[in-house]
Design a protein with these regions (language model features):
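RNase III-family endoribonuclease catalytic core
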Residues: 2-115
Length: 115
């Protein structure tokens, strides 16, 4: 599904090597890809949604910590607005293109059209 070469290229680009390759593969293959490609014989555990859930929380916490420290004169409302902007779908999509995640992520072509 995702070649070792592509994972290696991605790791080199972001400067991080994933210890658990199965986990990164699970995180990069959206279930819609399997349905779209009619690869129903290929079963992935439901890790994608679980990893998405966890990743959303980790990302929110990490960004909250950064803006809390950086904008020490801002009130809670201003910090919340900054956080909301930084974790919104459109902003994260731009980041994913910059990180070249789109070169390795597998998802339905129908899902791609919505982005």
């Amino acid at each position: 599904m995702i070649s070792t070469k592509k994972i290696d290229q991605f790791e080199n680009h972001i400067g991080y090597s994933f210890k658990n390759k199965k986990l990164i593969i699970s995180a990069l293959i959206h279930p819609s890809f399997l349905v779209d490609k009619k690869k129903t014989k290929f079963k992935l555990p439901n890790d994608f949604e679980r990893l998405e859930f966890l990743g959303d929380r980790v990302l929110g916490l990490a960004i909250s910590s950064i803006i809390y420290k950086k904008f020490d004169n801002n009130n809670e409302g201003d910090l919340s607005k900054k956080l909301s902007y930084l974790v919104q779908k459109n902003f994260l999509h731009k980041i994913s293109i910059n990180l070249k995640i789109n070169n390795i992520l597998k998802y339905s072509s129908k899902k791609n059209e919505k982005m």
